[in-house]
Amino acid sequence: MRILVSNDDGIYSPGLWALVKRLKEVGEVIVVAPDREQSATGTQVTLRQPLRVQKTHPLIPGIEAYAVEGSPCDCVILGLAKLITEPVDLVVSGINHGLNLGDDVLISGTVGAALQGYLRNIPSIAISIPVTMEEPENLDSAACITAEVARRIQNGDITKNSFLNINIPDLPLSQIEELRVTPLAHKTHIETVEEGHDGRKRYFWLRRRQLSSADNKKTDIWAIENGYITISALHERLFQQPVFTLKDAETAGILAAARSCQDKI
């Protein structure tokens, strides 16, 4: 099994190398990761400037590693298209320092990187662990869970077209009661804008805080808040065609109104 590993925390993130340590027991691992932190970049792809790549010294001997001046999505696209010459069997992104739950997957660079594998028909995993004021203490718990999921994909126990989002408490596995398959929760957020002045110009900080979390026991948020590992199959949630219909008269009316508006210019 050939595994491309990326992340959004940067190529020297402890979470990435904890993951590599366990995944190399499953197959051949190649690292293609950003040369610096790229959190909350979502599905950003660099189109207006060249991507520069440097083969770099791995923190684990024997691992082929590349640092990319680009986003997590850039890394996976470039890795699959140019840097890895043999077919890749699995894309894994993480271990992210910070959970990716509910609607937050839409802005996650970790999930965005895994998405690039899935869009190219490669099973893909995003793995995250919570962060408070200190670094996570149990990165190996997340790495071991990911390695086991990778084995099951390899063996055919988990479908080959999977796009999985895994979140795990920062605990030893012996203290985690259960792993649950969960749907994504819907979270309510508010963005606040803080203003400052550097002596010459105004500047702004965007701050995001969660107003409410799901109390539904079936969702990923409830499960992680209650000490469970969560696995969510994102391909079923993000790409399912929503129910949305318009009558022919309504579609014609929209087009006619738009044409009328344009004629007035």
Swiss-Prot record:
<dbReference type="GO" id="GO:0005737">
    <property type="term" value="C:cytoplasm"/>
</dbReference>
<feature type="binding site">
    <location>
        <position position="39"/>
    </location>
    <ligand>
        <name>a divalent metal cation</name>
    </ligand>
</feature>
<dbReference type="GO" id="GO:0008253">
    <property type="term" value="F:5'-nucleotidase activity"/>
</dbReference>
<dbReference type="GO" id="GO:0000166">
    <property type="term" value="F:nucleotide binding"/>
</dbReference>
<dbReference type="InterPro" id="IPR002828">
    <property type="entry name" value="SurE-like_Pase/nucleotidase"/>
</dbReference>
<feature type="binding site">
    <location>
        <position position="96"/>
    </location>
    <ligand>
        <name>a divalent metal cation</name>
    </ligand>
</feature>
<comment type="similarity">
    <text>Belongs to the SurE nucleotidase family.</text>
</comment>
<feature type="binding site">
    <location>
        <position position="9"/>
    </location>
    <ligand>
        <name>a divalent metal cation</name>
    </ligand>
</feature>
<dbReference type="GO" id="GO:0046872">
    <property type="term" value="F:metal ion binding"/>
</dbReference>
<feature type="binding site">
    <location>
        <position position="8"/>
    </location>
    <ligand>
        <name>a divalent metal cation</name>
    </ligand>
</feature>
<keyword id="KW-0547">Nucleotide-binding</keyword>
<keyword id="KW-0963">Cytoplasm</keyword>
<dbReference type="InterPro" id="IPR036523">
    <property type="entry name" value="SurE-like_sf"/>
</dbReference>
<comment type="function">
    <text>Nucleotidase that shows phosphatase activity on nucleoside 5'-monophosphates.</text>
</comment>
<protein>
    <recommendedName>
        <fullName>5'-nucleotidase SurE</fullName>
        <ecNumber>3.1.3.5</ecNumber>
    </recommendedName>
</protein>
<keyword id="KW-0479">Metal-binding</keyword>
<keyword id="KW-0378">Hydrolase</keyword>
<dbReference type="Pfam" id="PF01975">
    <property type="entry name" value="SurE"/>
</dbReference>
<dbReference type="InterPro" id="IPR030048">
    <property type="entry name" value="SurE"/>
</dbReference>
